[in-house]
């Protein structure tokens, strides 16, 4: 079983960008958490992808069709703006979990809208990087049904 973890803009700057909100761990640590959590859940492979470009994220979702069993996605800023990412998730119809490091629901008004959420069966917010481990756990439970 294969999982794909997709990270949007600025997540490559973890540990540098607003550590009071996103923590002090860097992106390499996030990748490590995803790989370890995926293995613990019984995934044969966890691919972790990051891009600052909306089209690259859409391309990656489309390329996943027929190749991955589930997606964990943190669209980051594109959460609140990207119908293209929503449409790509709907097009491939791969089970997906939305994850956010911070509790976006307690932040600025513009962060209250999530287009990606409309194509996801669950959303995890405010658990820091461990939210990815939780998302992979939910994904595995969903796939095992």
Model-flagged regions — what are they?
Residues 14-28:
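Glycine- and acidic-residue-enriched helix-capping/strand-helix junction motifs
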Residues 64-71:
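Short acidic/histidine-rich motifs immediately flanking catalytic phosphotransfer sites
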Residues 82-91:
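Short Gly/Thr/Asp-enriched flexible loops that form oxyanion-binding sites at enzyme active sites
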Residues 47-55:
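Short beta->alpha junction loops
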Residues 48, 106-145:
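Short, glycine-/small-residue-rich phosphate/pyrophosphate-handling segment
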Residues 9-11, 76-79, 102-104:
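Short glycine-rich anion-binding loops that position phosphate/pyrophosphate groups of nucleotides
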Residues 1-4:
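Extreme N-terminal starter segment of soluble prokaryotic enzymes
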Residues 90-107:
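Short, acidic/small-residue loops that bind anionic groups at enzyme active sites
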